[in-house]
Amino acid sequence: MTDIHIQDGDLSSLKDKVVVITGGSSGIGLATTNLLLDLGAKVVIGDLQPPTTRVDSERCSFHKVDVTVWSDQLTLFKEARELHGRIDHVFANAGVGPKADYLSTALDQNGDLVEPTFLTLDVNLKAVIYTATIACYYMREEQQSPAGGSIVIVSSVAGVSRFRAVDYATAKHGNLGFARGLHQRLTAENSPTRVNLIAPSWTNTGFMPPQIMAAVGVEPQEPASVGRAAAYLMADDSRKGQMIHIAKGRYREVEESIMLPAAEKVVDVENGGVMEDDTLAKIIETMGIFKAKATQ
């Protein structure tokens, strides 16, 4: 696991870039917005409410968006391109805390078990898929530069570990799975669009009251530390299919250095095991050959 040391110069390429951020009005999203503006980027925020603090820049625009609504996100991207002519980077950041209790015994007026809420899964997973899907469309359509655009997705340490906030953990595991699969598809199609993730540890975003965190002896990191990792993944076009873990200002790449090697051990690649995606690639190729022969 390699530590990453992010220097100010590493982010300089973001000057004049156009970045769409969902959930950019508070927490990690707002911290990232402010950093990008300081770097000279142009930021388009999609959120339910305007920024919680004044963002004093003509290069930042706010658009009221419910990220769980497909048409709202479509409008966000359309307006971003109308404003700036292109979209260079997308930060799929909008999220909420855990909401569902899968052990609840609450009954409705008919005496039946109450359906659990899907709000956290809708915001933290479904909406992220919406954001990335639309981002891929715009980046592919515009055929920007050879370096391509990039998508950064917010996962969490809860997405790689056991975490008893079940709906939140499920969504964050889903973020990782979605990004992994999307990276493989983009790579297979030789697309220049990059997808990466960040996995922050406890961060001061209002997820938990500060007095509670202090009582359990945990000092959350500031959102600005997390935003710096997101900006770094946008700026460094060598970063593809990676995930940066952030804890108290320390940055470490964990997908390629830890988790993928662990998967290879599960499959036992060293002793002839074959990764599932390698098999799927051969299946797709073989089906294409059969289809071509059938049409001859």
From Swiss-Prot:
Induction remark: Expression is induced on AF medium.
Protein name (record): Short-chain dehydrogenase/reductase ascJ
Keyword Oxidoreductase on entry: yes
Organism lineage string: Eukaryota, Fungi, Dikarya, Ascomycota, Pezizomycotina
Catalytic activity line of the entry: ascofuranol + A = ascofuranone + AH2
GO biological process: terpenoid biosynthetic process
Industrial and biotechnological uses noted in the record: Ascofuranone is a specific inhibitor of trypanosome alternative oxidase (TAO), and quickly kills African trypanosomes in vitro and cures infected mice. As an essential factor for trypanosome survival, TAO is a promising drug target due to the absence of alternative oxidases in the mammalian host.
Pathway: Secondary metabolite biosynthesis; terpenoid biosynthesis
Family membership noted in the UniProt record: Belongs to the short-chain dehydrogenases/reductases (SDR) family.
Annotated Pfam families: adh_short (PF00106)
This protein's encoding gene: ascJ
